[in-house]
Amino acid sequence: MTQTQSNHLILDFSHVYCDENIPRNDKLHWIHCSDIHECDLYCSDAAATEIHRRIDPYGTRGIHFLDSGNYHYVTKIMTDRIDEPFSLILFDHHTDMQSPMIEGMISCGDWARSVLLDNPQLQQLILIGPKKADIQAIYNDKEFTAKQKKRLKEKLIAFSAEELRADEGHEKVERIRMDVPFYISIDKDVLDERYCETNWNQGRMSLSLLEHLLRAFLETGNILVIDICGECQQGIPLPEYMEAEEKNAKTNRKLFEFLTHYIRRKSTIPRQKAPRHDEKA
């Protein structure tokens, strides 16, 4: 695989980033995806193969913008390319762990379930932001086999929106492994509507809390990729659309600047080899 110079990507499925007036520069490489069929909400094998082909030259590092939450399944395509043990940190108002609706297709609603159950390199999935009831629904899902339930119990660590607001769940932090690199995936629907407007119902997290939680991983962990999705709904009245786009563009810029600050800073610090999970630090 040949890796190009810029690892920061914009995957343009709906041209939403064009409407946000994101400047084109050498920091962000645009990958045009609007001509790919069978990829909105649900993604066929053919579409997944084509998406993989287009992102393959850019490696598995950097910050990637994935368009709206309809395309959040791209995170699965990205993580399928990782050839070393890793953990997925998922910020999302939804669990994205529904039972598959259409055989042979991944979707924005079930991709995380597929990563958890099927990716042999996944060590942990740290899910941050859904409602407590939605997290409990994962454990109550009767479609899991006994083997899948065991894997779920071993690998899933979930922090509900209620726990975050009450500053609870600290005991679960101790379970997070720090000896493997992190893939961080952010769906902006975890944020309150003051900060962005997405095409899905949203949580109530502040941008400052999201940055605080991200900082805990960015300062101490080895980060492979950070992806961001969650853009506004298409087809709404133009004044509402432009207002939403302005709000989303502002948050996208803030997140990009915040994340690149940590990436630049850590790139100047010699990386120390992390202890194995069975070793004492």
Which functions belong to the PLM regions below?
Residues T2-L66, N70-S87, D110, P120, ...:
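Catalytic cores of soluble, metal-dependent hydrolases
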